[in-house]
Amino acid sequence: MAAQIWYENDGDLSVLEGKKVAIIGYGSQGHAHALNLRDSGVDVVVGLRPTSKSVDFAKEQGLEVKSVAEASAEADVIMILAPDQYQRTIWANDIEPNIKPGAAVAFAHGFNIHYGYIKPSEDHPVFMVAPKGPGHIVRREYAAGRGVPVVVAVEQDPRGDGWALTLAYAKALGALRAGAIKTTFKEETETDLFGEQNVLMGGVNKLVEMGFEVLTDAGYQPEIAYFEVCHELKMLVDLMNEGGLNKARWSCSDTAQYGDYVNTVINEDCRKRMEYHLQRIQDGSFAKEFIDDQDAGAPHFKELQEKYSNERIETVGPKLRAMFSWNKDGVKDADEANSFTGKIARAQVQ
């Protein structure tokens, strides 16, 4: 069955007229949602801890900032954009005790609703608008008159206006310029986690790291190894984005194509491991492991961060990336992203 996709003419901004939208958190997605909605004429308030370093960022950009409790008490729509592991505490302590009857609760990722960490009462509409790109790209594309695609879902619809509200929000974000694909909280959560763990992060990162180690352990120069297993990956992914796997293949040499076809690194054993990890996502095992570690102060998470931030490939990358003139514009994007992430984003509403 073909996916249902909505575009610009399918959303009605008048649905948000007279309504106040609270954006909880001002990290990567938070700043993009707040600014895009504000520039679309929506009445926006940002909810943050009074001591959050993000308060100054938001105020400098002309946004109204209040505590999470105050913002929640006056909002008709509450978009929760704090990190997954903090959302349930923010909900229990600041949002649920203050939320107006019938106010809508929104998310950009289904994690806490799908796994039951947040359970709004049945009188609250619950919807999702999840951009398929980082916040600084969502903001940049909006400012350029374009948009980043989103996936959208409605989990609770007590009044029957859930989809109209969802599409109005997506339009205000600029997303309907690109398109909004209908999904469910379950599908978005499970596929998003699967993609991160098995392809985008846990797959690609491990391939790059291991490929680099195999070459350098065999005596090849680290700089040459970096070019072959990391640098060229970006160009190949760009070709995939433009024309799929086929364009990436026919853009390469016959030698490269043949090596692709006969490669045995990614095989049926890999598929079985992917299926195992999908099962852990589906049955909630991964979510419980992550949340339990976070509740304990994230000792395992911090240990892994330290371990992988010191991989050998990271000692070579900075020097070589400085050689690429076309990376100069990307540095600005990286700086912008970093200013809204890392320690500031993690501390935003705790």
UniProtKB/Swiss-Prot annotation:
User: What are the record keywords, sorted?
Assistant: Amino-acid biosynthesis, Branched-chain amino acid biosynthesis, Magnesium, Metal-binding, NADP, Oxidoreductase
Q: Which residues bind Mg(2+) 2?
A: 192, 228, 232
Domain annotation KARI C-terminal knotted: ranges: 184-327
- Per the UniProt entry, what are the Gene Ontology biological process annotations, in alphabetical order? isoleucine biosynthetic process; L-valine biosynthetic process
Q: What is its EC number?
A: 1.1.1.86
- Name the catalysed reactions: (2R)-2,3-dihydroxy-3-methylbutanoate + NADP(+) = (2S)-2-acetolactate + NADPH + H(+); (2R,3R)-2,3-dihydroxy-3-methylpentanoate + NADP(+) = (S)-2-ethyl-2-hydroxy-3-oxobutanoate + NADPH + H(+)
- UniProt keyword Amino-acid biosynthesis, yes or no: yes
Regions that span the bilayer: none
Q: Name the gene.
A: ilvC1
A molecular-function term among this protein's GO annotations: ketol-acid reductoisomerase activity
Q: In which pathway does it act?
A: Amino-acid biosynthesis; L-isoleucine biosynthesis; L-isoleucine from 2-oxobutanoate: step 2/4; Amino-acid biosynthesis; L-valine biosynthesis; L-valine from pyruvate: step 2/4
Q: Which top-level group of life is the source organism from? A: Bacteria
Q: What InterPro entries does UniProt report for this protein, alphabetically?
A: 6-PGluconate_DH-like_C_sf (IPR008927), KARI (IPR013023), KARI_C (IPR000506), KARI_N (IPR013116), KARI_prok (IPR014359), NAD(P)-bd_dom_sf (IPR036291)
Q: How is the cofactor bound?
A: Binds 2 magnesium ions per subunit.
Q: Which GO terms describe its cellular component?
A: cytosol
- Active site per the UniProt annotation: 109
Q: Which residues form the KARI N-terminal Rossmann domain?
A: 3-183
Q: What is this protein called?
A: Ketol-acid reductoisomerase (NADP(+)) 1
Record-linked PROSITE patterns: KARI_C, KARI_N
Q: Name one Pfam family in it.
A: KARI_C
The protein's job, in short, is: Involved in the biosynthesis of branched-chain amino acids (BCAA). Catalyzes an alkyl-migration followed by a ketol-acid reduction of (S)-2-acetolactate (S2AL) to yield (R)-2,3-dihydroxy-isovalerate. In the isomerase reaction, S2AL is rearranged via a Mg-dependent methyl migration to produce 3-hydroxy-3-methyl-2-ketobutyrate (HMKB). In the reductase reaction, this 2-ketoacid undergoes a metal-dependent reduction by NADPH to yield (R)-2,3-dihydroxy-isovalerate.
Binding site residues for NADP(+): 26-29, 49, 52, 54, 84-87, 135
